[in-house]
């Protein structure tokens, strides 16, 4: 369970004694100026602690016990190892009888391998390698140490191996270099000899789906409190496999270490989904800056991508790759922006650029590769290069086609001229649609719990861009993307092609959002990438240094004439932010073949650091500079600062020397050394009364401040006067606050007068994170401006700010009173905020009385602004140079001589907002630095926190402090997922890892290695870590979060549990569920700080037997949601949900429309099509109370609130398959085999159905008959589609809800016994009405054949079980049924009492299944009048026998299947008879499926019940697909679900059924889920004729009718190409019947079909066209398996099979193996030679139409028995489906049929077709097997585009109906004639007779 925070050392030590980390040094402070080498060292020191170890943590940290351990090893006794070669459950066993009492059973013991003398390192070594030798020696010691739990050998082993001392399993011995006879030492683990705890453990897995809950359970079950070592194989629950690939101890790789409570597991997937986005910006066509002669795109396609794919191939990973090219095209209409506003808002455009010339633009996306296996990287690169040739042309000319006029005339001519004037070109990368692409990629997998792929884990998005890592974005897009990525587990990697820039990356620059009420004033701000120093109006937040480009004078001089120098609108405030969810890297070229990763706070790579310190490389290429001959070899003119002889270099260098001990000043005060780089040019000042920098200097020492001041005085000479403009602006500066009164135009609740980016003002920010303090917090005031700024600041201005537990540092350093830059009077503001109210306390300075505090209400009706709030490390624009140097807000005006800075508190919601000067009630969201480590706070005259709380409470009671606002400002909304800083000068020494990487922090073992990182992240993406250390600070937690509490307790009446769950188990379930939903456990001291406590009792998540007691909590977070799970009241779990407040509304800009309208061209599209996506729709909040109640057992219904996993499967009927099960009776046709396969599956489902304990108890205490299996699955088989059956036979359908069977309710007879059977009495009982306990007997139709007064074998089996006391199961009942059959020989002899019933066709013995039987003539009762609606002699029969069953009421009993009258009907709603009218007000309800709880862990490998909900069809047509759907919520291991599905697939494959996963949504709706996929439309070249076929049978009659079904010809085409029905459209069902499934109502718009291979879906639209879509859920690993097996089978068949074996009617020389021979789960289906057994459903097997050699018109219908996939010549050039060469199966030599019995006579003609490409019979197999969907699509399209073939096909359909007229007269099963020329009745009537 969750570990406690690391500041609770006692708990840590008691939990795992002796655990220690590696070396953890507290490195000294570095001062501001340092060289590049010292810069590197400081980075190493900054990262020396393990991630998350804060200085405030009180955890005990021990040194690595290398020296102490080695000394002990020399004196300890050695023991001998014996290797256990057999399979052992225990890894290490100790013979404690020989070892002694030093080691107790159950204690931790370390096994150290004693080095041999030859392995010891040499004693002499170079001194400079001393540290390396020390580390290597320590590592060597660690590598040979194995820690285990001591366990004594069993007595039998001791008796057998009496001399064995240490018994080690072989895999452990191999990993630690132990052999038989190896000497080891045994050392108990205690505080003197601690175990070396691993900081990170990496595990890799492949070909399986692991949820994060699975990862947690695996870590706890197999890794926790054990030694882990590199190469270790981990097997969890016997099915989940993973391998330990790396072990880290404090960032250093180790061979092994102990997995303790602080160890962080990192799971990496080698079978993930990759989406590669390539930004085709304008720079992609530019030449490389390095002068290599390559354009950018060539570097991508010839450099990076081949290197990436080769890495994948070397690691043998199995990823699915999707590649999308995206670009933004800007349009220059040739007129000014003002005049072009109307055209800019044309519906064609996606939006309008907010920068530069505000050009309209259109976003384009081109899908090049869609979910292709990573092994086919050569095809991927070829497709990329091919698409590159056309991409630029397509996107540049698309507007001419999309905007072309539709009408003719003069207007259209003028519009065409205007279109030709429009200039279209790709935008620069900085202005591209970068965020939109990421947002769309994240939407791809936002619902990954639907259609769950059980073979892949993880999604990784890689964006390849020609940008150096800088993007200008819209605030809205950044906020949406940030919120989307903060809550999912998608990793985003940015690969930049240019060189690494000199500033921090990745960088997003955006304008502050404009809130309603703010005045927007247009002012051109140049944000072009080509800005030069000559430009006066500069970009805020750019890459220039603060002292240069952003000096106040330059900005003032850049003001245009007539433009006021007052405050500009917030739209022109630029903010530079770094996202936490984006990891950037730079492709450095093919020579290095490695990625140079750019850390957030690191600005240069190693290659740059190798340059001499006095050489400055020019990194930007400007045209003006190049024309002035400024080349790379020129030296910079300005000398470095330290080369000046006047510069106090020695003082600066001396100040960088670390001081290990605290010093005392002259007054005896403690001088605490800095733990980070000082934030100002001078050292920290500790006095608060006056500015005295020399106060703390030592006697006789000149302070560094004084030396730097002298240097400034020497070099800087201020001008003696100022010009008029400066004087006027200074005056305006002073008068602006008075003019503004209570106005506020800034989104942050602060306004300002002059936007001079003096960095001193940026110190007004409240406390920043101790790890990531942006550069802007350092005081870097240019000396030239110091006095002028002081002169301008002689007025005290109201300042809106917020203050956590201490005041902002800059406020404590500088006062802006009339004293200029002096030390402010002591004042500290504290804030203590609760959810109900919030406020802050004000500390009065000694020089001011409480009378100076005044409360000023704001103007009624005016919208107050929020005070400044910055969110966790992402201080947004307040830290950027665009922010106000000094913020002024309306408030009380103090005298000008006041040294204090009044801070206004404002309320956004209350009209009379009370304002309290002095501090803000709104705390910043920046993480507070540890209070104990802040010397300014500890050693000042600040007020105590408890006193401040008292003062605050008194003010709160007095009503002086308003409530907190209910919304957050737009700036705060981006925090803490963005880090705002000055990109050109970041603070490199204060990087908060929890802030920097947020969710991904614990993935990186060594953060300091981010500059150069290999390919691990790109080759095997990591899952979101289980733990995180980020937690909001106390102030932001109280001010920005709302609390929602509730309690959860276990439902003790839950039926699913044998024993109710304990609270520990319930808590584990709640934690596991949240893990699977993306939550992370929060560890570290941040939680305790946020709650204002020294420590918080938290559970240890990685402990196996950690007992939960009241008061223990677990904190979990995801995005803006925090959950606190606490144990309370002995048995309950209290859940506190903290949700961040919503973002404050603001007016959207005109360039951000509500709907995003890009142009997308999918893989198969011929052109771009504009699509609309709603990216603004808010995400629905989840009802966690309901979810937790479901886990606790209070409800068991899976609803959409739960976001449960779900997957849909179909069983596709295959042709030419035989059952390979031993003992299967011969004589079954294909249809009967498939039905038998479904029955076997149903028995498996029934066997492993989860039975609740109460039912089990009833079965245990009930009679014998209660234990019998009564087959409750109750599947009804029909030979028509469900819609037709419901419309025609509603009343007799047992699926009808609200009805009740009365069978077995009346029993007036004694039960029978198989020992003494009276056949007459038994026959009488069988033939009773169903209400009286008889067997259901009725007329049944199967296809076109009618059987009178018959029953079904499964019904009889259930009846025998119910009426015989001595039958135990269905097998015995089936055996009894066989005894009751009439034997064939007895019937021929005419003997009496030979049996009760016979098979209707006399082909089968009695079997439990869908077999029809009739009572023999001897015992058959005469039918009373009205028993049947039709007489036997009639040729036509109505479909619904009305007198068969009396009306029923109540709910039907589905204890056994009940067959119904069968008949045929057209596949259309036009001739479908209406269902019987329901009573007024209520529709009859029909449920087509049923759900059961299925146990996926019947082998009991888990510690808890593992259940899924299995939905199965109850009404099934064997010609169509059988549907399955599984839903699950909290299964322990997802691999259990996959194992069950594989078992089902294996079982079904032996009965001619293929199990394939298909999407839950229909094919036409794929674009709503995946914007980069679209169904492919195929139109018919010739529309189908309106004339109907001559003969067609109505469902109510056998007489020929002339009413064809709607889309009759389209369905015939699909059946011709081996498509079978998957799901009917909702409109097909009768409108007067309430039809539903167990999972919901039918919602398909079109009827969907699926190919028998399972690889492609097809739909028929309302206008008669086809929509085709590849089934990407079809498991890709089946392709390779089928390819290998087919090639092998082909080789074998060529050698062994003779010409007489093959396809019937074709007699091919080889047995063709179709691609459908293998299932998605690599299960081969039997493929014996086809025989001439009867086929009851000819519609499934299209029979070749044999024609003479001279017949060409029938060629289109001469398709072979096989799938069209195996006929590649139809797609070959020059060959059309209508040609003679397309007849038959290409590549096969057909021999004439020599009169096979029962077959129509074939011609003697021999048709020979060459294989495509001229190869042999198997030449094409290896290429098209992986392209099944493309082959099927191409073949179907070629046929539909061939007008001659279509017309011939239509004629065939019309004339084929004539052949069926005799089928009704013969009285036998008339075969389905759709598309095939001859009647099946002719072929099989002779045999059946």
UniProtKB/Swiss-Prot annotation:
Q: Locate the compositionally biased regions of type Low complexity.
A: 865-877, 1737-1789, 1801-1811
From the Swiss-Prot or TrEMBL record, state where the protein is found: Vacuole membrane
Q: Which Gene3D superfamilies match?
A: Winged helix-like DNA-binding domain superfamily/Winged helix DNA-binding domain
- Upper lineage ranks? Eukaryota, Fungi, Dikarya, Ascomycota, Pezizomycotina
Q: Which domain of life does this protein belong to?
A: Eukaryota
One annotated GO molecular function: GTPase activator activity
- What family does this belong to? Belongs to the IML1 family.
GO CC entries:
GATOR1 complex; vacuolar membrane
* Membrane in keyword set: yes
Which organism is the protein's source?
A: Chaetomium globosum (strain ATCC 6205 / CBS 148.51 / DSM 1962 / NBRC 6347 / NRRL 1970)
Entry's Pfam families?
DEP (PF00610), DEPDC5_CTD (PF19418), IML1 (PF12257)
**What name does the UniProt record give this protein?**
Vacuolar membrane-associated protein IML1
> Which keywords annotate this record?
Membrane, Vacuole
Q: Where is the composition biased (Polar residues)?
A: 47-60, 747-766, 787-804, 840-853
Gene Ontology biological-process entries: intracellular signal transduction; negative regulation of TORC1 signaling; positive regulation of autophagy
């Amino acid at each position: 369970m969750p570990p406690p925070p690391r500041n609770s050392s006692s708990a840590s030590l008691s939990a795992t004694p002796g655990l220690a980390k590696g070396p953890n040094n507290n490195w000294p402070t570095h001062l501001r100026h340092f060289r590049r080498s010292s810069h590197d060292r400081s980075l190493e020191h900054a990262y020396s602690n393990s991630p998350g170890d804060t200085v405030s943590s009180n955890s005990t940290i021990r040194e690595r016990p290398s020296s102490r351990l080695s000394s002990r090893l020399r004196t300890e006794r050695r023991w001998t190892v014996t290797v256990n070669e057999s399979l052992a459950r225990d890894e290490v066993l100790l013979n404690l009888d020989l070892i002694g009492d030093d080691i107790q059973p159950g204690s931790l013991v370390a096994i150290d391998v004693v080095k041999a003398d030859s392995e010891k390192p040499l004693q002499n070594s170079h001194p400079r390698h001393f540290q390396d030798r020390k580390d290597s020696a320590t590592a060597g010691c660690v590598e040979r140490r194995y820690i285990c739990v001591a366990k004594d050998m069993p007595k039998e082993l001791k008796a057998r191996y009496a001399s064995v001392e240490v018994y080690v399993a072989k895999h452990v011995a191999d990993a630690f270099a132990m052999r038989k006879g190896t000497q080891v030492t045994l050392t108990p683990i205690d505080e003197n000899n601690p175990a070396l705890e691993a900081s990170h453990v990496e595990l890799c897995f492949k070909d399986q789906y692991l949820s994060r809950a699975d990862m947690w359970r695996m870590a706890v079950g197999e890794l926790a409190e054990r030694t882990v070592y590199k190469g270790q194989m981990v097997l969890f629950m016997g099915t989940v496999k993973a391998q330990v690939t790396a072990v880290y101890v404090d960032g250093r790789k180790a061979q092994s270490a102990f997995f303790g409570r602080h160890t962080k597991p990192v799971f990496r997937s080698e079978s993930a989904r990759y989406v590669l986005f390539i930004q085709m910006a304008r720079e992609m066509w530019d030449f490389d800056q390095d002068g290599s002669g390559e354009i950018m795109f060539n570097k991508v396609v010839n450099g990076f991508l081949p290197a990436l794919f080769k890495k994948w191939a070397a690691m043998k990973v199995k990823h699915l790759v999707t590649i999308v090219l995206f670009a933004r095209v800007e349009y220059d209409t040739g007129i000014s922006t003002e005049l072009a506003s109307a055209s800019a808002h044309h519906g064609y455009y996606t939006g309008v650029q907010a920068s530069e010339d505000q050009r309209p633009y259109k976003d384009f996306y081109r899908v090049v590769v869609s979910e292709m296996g990573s092994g086919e990287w050569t095809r991927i690169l070829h497709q990329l290069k091919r698409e590159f040739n056309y991409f630029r042309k397509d996107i540049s000319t698309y507007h001419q086609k999309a905007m072309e006029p539709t009408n003719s005339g003069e207007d259209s001519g003028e519009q065409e001229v205007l279109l030709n004037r429009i200039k279209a070109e790709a935008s620069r990368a900085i202005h591209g649609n970068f965020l939109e692409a990421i947002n769309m990629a994240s939407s791809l997998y936002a619902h990954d719990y639907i259609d769950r792929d059980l073979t892949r884990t993880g999604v990784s998005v890689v964006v390849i861009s020609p940008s150096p890592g800088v993007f200008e974005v819209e605030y809205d897009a950044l906020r949406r993307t940030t919120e989307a990525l903060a809550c999912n587990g998608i990793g985003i990697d940015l690969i930049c092609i240019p060189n690494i820039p000199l500033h921090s990356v990745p960088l997003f620059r955006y304008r502050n959002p404009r809130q309603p009420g703010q005045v927007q004033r247009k002012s051109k701000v140049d944000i072009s990438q080509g800005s030069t120093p000559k430009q006066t109006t500069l970009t805020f937040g750019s890459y220039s240094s603060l002292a240069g480009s952003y000096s106040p004078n330059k900005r003032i001089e850049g003001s245009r004439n007539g433009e006021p120098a007052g405050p500009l609108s917030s739209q022109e405030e630029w903010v530079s932010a770094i996202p936490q969810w984006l990891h950037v890297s730079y492709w450095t070229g093919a020579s290095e073949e490695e990625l140079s990763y750019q850390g957030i706070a690191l600005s240069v790579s190693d290659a740059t650091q190798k340059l001499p310190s006095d050489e400055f490389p020019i990194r930007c290429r400007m045209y003006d500079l190049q024309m002035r001959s400024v080349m790379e070899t020129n030296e910079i003119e300005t000398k470095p600062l330290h080369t000046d002889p006047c510069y106090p270099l020695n003082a600066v260098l001396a100040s960088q020397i670390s001081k290990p001990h605290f010093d005392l000043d002259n007054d005896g005060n403690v001088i605490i050394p800095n733990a980070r780089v000082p934030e100002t040019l001078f050292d920290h000042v500790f006095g608060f009364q006056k500015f005295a920098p020399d106060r703390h200097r030592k006697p006789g020492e000149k302070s560094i401040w004084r030396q730097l001041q002298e240097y400034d005085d020497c070099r800087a000479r201020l001008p003696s006067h100022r010009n008029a403009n400066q004087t006027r602006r200074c005056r305006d500066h002073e008068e602006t606050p008075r003019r503004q009164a209570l106005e506020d135009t800034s989104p942050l609740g602060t306004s300002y007068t002059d936007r001079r980016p003096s960095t001193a003002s940026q110190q007004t920010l409240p406390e920043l994170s101790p790890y990531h303090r942006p550069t802007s917090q350092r005081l870097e005031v240019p000396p030239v401006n110091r006095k002028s700024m002081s002169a301008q600041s002689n007025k005290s201005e109201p300042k809106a700010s917020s203050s956590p537990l201490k005041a902002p540092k800059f406020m404590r350093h500088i006062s802006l009173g009339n004293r200029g830059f002096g030390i402010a009077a002591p004042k500290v503001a504290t804030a203590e905020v609760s959810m109900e109210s919030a406020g802050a306390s004000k500390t009065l300075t000694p020089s001011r009385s409480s009378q100076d505090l005044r409360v000023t209400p704001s103007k009624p009706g005016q919208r107050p602004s929020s005070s400044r709030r910055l969110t966790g490390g992402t201080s947004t624009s307040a830290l950027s140079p665009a922010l106000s140097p000094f913020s002024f807000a309306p408030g009380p005006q103090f005298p000008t001589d006041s040294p204090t800075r009044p801070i206004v508190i404002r309320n956004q919601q209350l009209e009379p907002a009370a304002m309290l000067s002095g501090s803000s009630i709104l705390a910043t969201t920046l993480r507070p630095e540890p209070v104990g480590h802040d010397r300014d706070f500890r050693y000042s005259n600040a007020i105590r926190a408890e006193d401040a709380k008292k003062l605050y409470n008194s003010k709160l009671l007095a009503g002086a402090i308003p409530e907190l606002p209910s919304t957050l400002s737009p700036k705060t909304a981006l925090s803490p997922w963005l880090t705002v800083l000055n990109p050109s000068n970041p603070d490199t020494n204060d990087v908060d890892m929890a802030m920097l990487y947020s969710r991904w922090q614990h993935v990186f073992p060594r953060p300091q290695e981010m500059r150069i990182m290999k390919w691990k992240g790109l080759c095997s993406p990591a899952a979101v870590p289980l733990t995180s250390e980020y937690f909001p600070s106390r102030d932001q937690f109280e001010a920005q979060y709302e609390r929602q509490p509730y309690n959860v307790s276990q439902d003790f009446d839950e039926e699913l549990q044998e024993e109710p769950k304990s609270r520990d188990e319930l808590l584990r379930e709640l934690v596991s569920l949240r893990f699977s939903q993306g939550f992370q456990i929060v560890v570290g001291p941040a939680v305790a700080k946020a709650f204002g406590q020294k420590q918080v009792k938290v559970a240890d998540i990685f402990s196996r037997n950690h007992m939960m007691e009241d008061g223990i909590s677990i904190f979990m977070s995801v995005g803006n949601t925090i959950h606190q799970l606490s144990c309370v009241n002995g048995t309950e779990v209290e859940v506190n949900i903290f949700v961040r407040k919503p973002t404050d509304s603001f007016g959207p800009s005109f360039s951000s429309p509500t709907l995003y309208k890009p142009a997308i061209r999918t893989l198969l599209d011929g052109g771009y099509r504009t699509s609309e996506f709603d990216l603004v729709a808010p995400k629905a909040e989840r009802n966690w109370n309901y979810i937790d109640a479901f886990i606790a057992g209070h409800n068991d219904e899976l609803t959409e609130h739960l976001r449960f996993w779900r997957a849909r499967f179909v069983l596709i009927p295959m042709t030419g398959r035989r059952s390979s099960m031993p003992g299967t009776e011969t004589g079954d046709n294909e249809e009967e085999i498939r039905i038998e396969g479904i029955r076997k599956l149903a028995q498996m489902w029934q066997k492993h159905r989860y039975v609740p304990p109460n039912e089990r108890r009833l079965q245990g205490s009930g009679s014998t008959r209660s234990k019998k299996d009564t087959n409750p699955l109750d599947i009804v088989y029909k030979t028509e589609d469900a819609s037709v059956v419901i419309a025609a036979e509603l009343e007799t359908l047992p699926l009808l809800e609200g009805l009740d069977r009365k069978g077995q309710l009346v029993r007036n007879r004694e039960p029978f016994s198989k020992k003494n059977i009276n056949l007459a009495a038994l026959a009488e009982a069988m033939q009773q009405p169903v209400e009286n306990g008889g067997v259901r007997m009725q007329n049944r139709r199967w296809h076109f054949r009618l059987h009178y007064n018959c029953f079904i074998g499964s019904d009889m089996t259930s009846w025998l079980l119910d009426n015989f006391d001595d039958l135990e199961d269905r097998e015995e009942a089936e055996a009894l049924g066989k005894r009751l059959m009439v034997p064939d020989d007895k019937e021929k002899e005419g003997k009496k009492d030979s049996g009760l019933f016979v098979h209707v066709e006399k082909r089968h013995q009695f079997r439990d299944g869908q077999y029809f039987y009739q009572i023999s003539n001897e015992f058959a009762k005469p039918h009373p009048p009205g028993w049947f609606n039709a007489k036997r002699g009639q040729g036509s029969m109505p479909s619904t026998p009305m007198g068969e069953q009396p009306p029923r009421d109540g709910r039907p009993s589905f204890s056994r299947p009940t067959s119904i009258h069968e008949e045929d009907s057209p596949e259309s709603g036009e001739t479908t008879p209406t269902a019987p009218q329901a009573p007024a007000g209520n529709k009859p309800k029909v449920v087509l499926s049923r759900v059961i709880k299925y146990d996926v862990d019947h082998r009991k490998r888990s510690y808890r019940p593992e259940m899924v909900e299995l939905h199965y069809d109850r009404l099934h047509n064997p010609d169509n697909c059988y549907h399955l759907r599984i839903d699950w919520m909290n299964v322990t291991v997802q691999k259990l679900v996959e194992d069950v599905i594989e078992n089902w697939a294996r079982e079904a494959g032996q009965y001619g059924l293929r199990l394939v996963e298909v999407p839950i949504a229909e094919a036409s709706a794929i674009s709503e889920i995946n914007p980069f996929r679209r169904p492919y439309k195929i139109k018919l070249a010739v529309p189908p004729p309106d004339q109907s076929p001559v003969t067609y049978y109505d469902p109510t009659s056998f007489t020929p009718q002339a009413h064809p079904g709607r889309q009759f010809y389209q369905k015939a085409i699909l059946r011709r190409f081996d498509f079978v029905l998957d799901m009917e459209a909702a409109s097909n069902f009768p409108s007067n019947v309430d039809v539903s499934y167990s999972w919901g109502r039918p919602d398909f718009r079109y009827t969907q079909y699926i190919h028998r291979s399972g690889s492609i879906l097809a739909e028929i639209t309302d206008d008669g066209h086809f929509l085709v879509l590849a089934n990407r859920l079809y498991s890709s690993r089946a392709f390779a398996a089928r390819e290998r097996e087919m090639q092998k089978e082909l080789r074998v068949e060529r050698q062994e099979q003779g010409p007489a074996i093959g396809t019937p009617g074709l007699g091919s020389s080889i047995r063709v193996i179709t691609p459908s021979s293998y299932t998605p789960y690599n299960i081969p289906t039997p493929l014996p030679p086809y025989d001439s057994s009867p086929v009851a459903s000819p519609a499934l097997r299209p029979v070749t139409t044999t024609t003479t050699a001279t017949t060409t018109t029938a060629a289109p219908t001469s398709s072979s028995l096989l799938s069209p996939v195996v006929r590649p010549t139809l797609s070959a050039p020059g060959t059309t489906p209508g040609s003679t060469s397309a007849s038959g199966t290409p590549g096969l030599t057909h021999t004439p049929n020599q009169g096979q019995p029962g077959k129509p006579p074939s011609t003697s003609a021999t048709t020979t077709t060459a294989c495509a490409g001229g190869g042999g019979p198997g030449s094409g197999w290896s290429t098209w097997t992986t392209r099944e969907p493309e082959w099927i699509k191409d073949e179907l399209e070629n046929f539909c585009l061939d007008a001659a073939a279509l017309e011939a096909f239509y004629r065939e359909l019309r004339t084929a109906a004539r052949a069926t007229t005799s089928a009704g007269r013969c009285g036998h099963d008339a075969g389905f004639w759709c598309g095939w020329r001859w009647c099946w009745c002719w072929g099989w009537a002779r045999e059946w007779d």
